[in-house]
Curated annotation (Swiss-Prot):
This is Holliday junction branch migration complex subunit RuvB. Keywords: ATP-binding, Cytoplasm, DNA damage, DNA recombination, DNA repair, DNA-binding, Hydrolase, Nucleotide-binding. The lineage of its organism: Bacteria, Pseudomonadati, Chlamydiota, Chlamydiia, Chlamydiales. Its EC number is 3.6.4.-. Has 3 domains, the large (RuvB-L) and small ATPase (RuvB-S) domains and the C-terminal head (RuvB-H) domain. The head domain binds DNA, while the ATPase domains jointly bind ATP, ADP or are empty depending on the state of the subunit in the translocation cycle. During a single DNA translocation step the structure of each domain remains the same, but their relative positions change. It comes from the Bacteria. It comes from Chlamydia caviae (strain ATCC VR-813 / DSM 19441 / 03DC25 / GPIC). GO terms for molecular function: ATP binding; ATP hydrolysis activity; four-way junction DNA binding; four-way junction helicase activity.
Length: 337
C-alpha cells in the first residue's frame, strides 16, 4: 500500500513538473491561447477580475494546465475542486467564502456537479453573492453574503451535459482539439529537457505519432521509453529504441492500443462490422460505456476507423485495411524470426 501511494505521488510530481507556467510555454491550441491571452491581459490592464472561463474537449489535452495558467497570469491564488464532490450548497459554501479577490476557482469535471449545487453557484458567478440559511424550522431565515470577486474556470469532457443557464454565465469558452504530431514533438522536446532525457528528434516524433494527439499520453510514453532505454539500451534513445519500447506496450504506429484493436476486431468478428449498440459493445469488450465514449471512440472516429450511426457503431474500410496491414506486419516479423 505504501509503495502504491509512493508511485502515485511520483506520478503527480511528474505531471506538475512538466506543466507550462504561462501561455508562451503552452504549445498547440494556438487560436484558443491567442484569444485567452487577449482576454486575460485586457482584464488585468483594466484592473479587473477576468470573467469566468470554460474549457472543454477530450481528456489529457491541457484543461487543468490552462486553469493554472489563468491563475498565474492574473497573479492570484488557485482553489481546486472536482465536480462529483459538489452535490449540495454546503459543499460549495466553504470554498466560495475562502476565496480572496481575484482568486481562480477551478472546477474539474464541472458537468458532474449536483443540480442543487450548480444552481447555488449561479448567483456567486453573476453577482458574487450567496444566500446562507441561518437556524432551522420556523425561525429559519436567509442571509445574503457578499463574496470577493473571483474567476471560475470550468473544465469538462462533455460540454453537452452542461445546462444552458450555467453555460451562459461563462464569458470565455474554448474548445480543445487533438494536437498535431509536430506540436506533440515540440512538447516532448520541452519535457525531455526538463527531465534530463537525452533523446533525438526522430525518437520523440515516434512517440508523438503514437500518442493519440494527447500531451498527457505523450509524456507518459516518454517516461516509459526512458525506463526501457535505461534497462535495455544503455540509456540510448533513438527511433529504433522508441519503436521497441512502444511495441512492448502493444501500441501500433497509429497509436492504437490493445483495447482499440479489441474494440474494432470485436465489431468485425462478432457483428459483421456493425452496426452494434454501445451497451452490447461495452459488455463484449469489457469496458464501461463512459470509458468507451470518452477515451476510445473519439480517437477512432477522428482516424476514420469507426463511425457512429443511429443504429450503432460501425467499422470503416479504413479500419479493415489498417488491421490487415498490422496482421501482415506481424506475419512478416514471424517469418523473419
Amino acid at each position: 500500500m505504501t509503495h502504491q501511494v509512493s508511485v502515485l505521488h511520483q506520478d503527480k510530481k511528474f505531471d506538475i513538473s512538466l506543466r507550462p507556467k504561462g501561455l508562451r510555454e503552452f504549445c498547440g491550441q494556438k487560436q484558443l491561447t491567442e484569444r485567452l491571452e487577449l482576454f486575460l491581459h485586457a482584464a488585468v490592464q483594466r484592473g479587473e477580475v477576468p470573467g469566468h472561463c470554460l474549457f472543454f474537449g477530450p481528456p489529457g489535452l491541457g484543461k487543468t494546465s490552462l486553469a493554472h495558467i489563468v491563475a498565474h497570469t492574473v497573479g492570484k491564488g488557485l482553489v481546486v475542486a472536482s465536480g462529483p464532490q459538489l452535490v449540495k450548497p454546503s459543499d460549495l459554501l466553504g470554498l466560495l467564502t475562502s476565496l480572496q479577490e481575484g482568486d481562480v476557482f477551478f472546477i474539474d469535471e464541472i458537468h458532474r456537479m449536483g443540480k442543487v449545487a450548480e444552481e447555488y453557484l449561479y448567483s456567486a458567478m453573476e453577482d458574487y453573492k450567496i444566500d446562507i440559511t441561518i437556524d432551522s424550522g420556523p425561525g429559519a431565515r436567509s442571509v445574503s453574503v457578499d463574496l470577493a470577486p473571483f474567476s471560475l474556470v470550468g473544465a469538462t469532457t462533455r460540454s453537452g451535459m452542461l445546462s444552458e443557464p450555467l453555460r451562459a454565465r461563462f464569458s470565455f469558452t474554448g474548445r480543445m482539439s487533438y494536437y498535431s504530431d509536430e506540436d506533440l514533438t515540440t512538447i516532448l522536446k520541452r519535457s525531455s529537457n526538463l527531465l534530463g532525457i537525452d533523446a533525438d528528434t526522430a525518437a520523440l516524433y515516434e512517440i508523438a505519432r503514437r500518442s493519440r494527439g494527447t500531451p498527457r499520453l505523450a509524456n507518459n510514453l516518454l517516461r516509459w521509453v526512458r525506463d526501457f532505454a535505461q534497462m535495455r539500451e544503455g540509456n540510448c534513445i533513438n527511433s529504433d529504441v522508441a519503436e521497441k519500447a512502444l511495441a512492448m506496450l502493444l501500441i501500433d504506429d497509429w497509436g492504437l492500443n490493445e483495447i482499440d484493436i479489441k474494440l474494432l476486431t470485436t465489431i468485425i468478428d462478432y457483428y459483421q462490422g456493425g452496426p452494434v449498440g454501445i451497451k452490447t459493445l461495452s459488455v463484449a469488450v469489457g469496458e464501461d460505456i463512459k470509458t468507451l465514449e470518452d477515451v476510445y471512440e473519439p480517437f477512432l472516429i477522428l482516424k476514420g476507423l469507426l463511425k457512429k450511426t443511429s443504429r450503432g457503431r460501425m467499422v470503416t474500410q479504413i479500419a479493415y485495411n489498417h488491421l490487415k496491414r498490422c496482421s501482415d506486419n506481424l506475419q512478416s516479423l514471424g517469418e523473419e524470426k
